[in-house]
Regions:
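Short, well-structured N-terminal submotif of metal-dependent ribonuclease cores
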Residues: 1-42, 57-67, 140
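Acidic, PIN/NYN-like endoribonuclease modules and their adjacent C-terminal/linker elements
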Residues: 1-2, 107-140
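Conserved glycosyltransferase catalytic-site signature
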Residues: 11, 83, 102-103
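Acidic catalytic patch
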Residues: 21, 41-48, 70-94
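Active-site-proximal, substrate-binding regions of enzyme catalytic domains
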Residues: 51-77
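Beta-rich strand-turn-strand
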Residues: 97-98
Length: 140
């Protein structure tokens, strides 16, 4: 990995980093976000999932949601899901055992040329297309 490497974060990593639901995972996720900084990539799907879950679980006010969205777009690269990503996600579902939503995340990470996808939901250590390694940052 180089200083120019990019990393994809799934919504579960953000949810731990932004909530106090699990102190150990929150610490791990927060450290990961801090360490990776502006090299972080994620999709509008992740923004949506994070916002809806924080709104539901943490009762965030709409003003706080707007500030969070602004922060995401200001500090990180938020990737739009395009037709090519949807097609790639379909192919991933056909050839691997990805769920619909996980296939979109994986296809988006591949499209953004990320080297690592951090997610709690997918198979830790799996390398996709010899390009993208999936890592569960909470696995000990």
């Amino acid at each position: 990995m180089t200083d120019e490497s990019s990393f994809f974060l799934d919504s579960n990593v953000w949810l731990y980093a932004l909530s106090n639901e699990d102190a150990e995972k929150a610490e791990t996720a927060s450290a990961l976000v801090k360490d990776l900084g502006e090299r972080i990539r994620f999709t509008t799907q992740v923004v949506n999932e994070v916002c809806v879950n924080l709104k539901r679980k943490s009762s965030l006010e709409e003003g706080e949601i707007r500030r969070l969205i602004d922060s995401f777009y200001l500090n990180y690269t938020v990737v739009e899901i395009k037709e090519s990503v949807l097609i790639s996600a379909s192919e991933l579902r056909e050839h691997h055992s990805f769920s619909f939503w996980d296939s979109l995340i994986a296809a988006s990470a591949l499209s953004a040329n990320a080297e690592i996808l951090y997610s709690e939901d997918m198979q830790d250590g799996f390398v996709l297309d010899n390009k993208l390694k999936i890592i569960n940052p909470f696995k000990i």
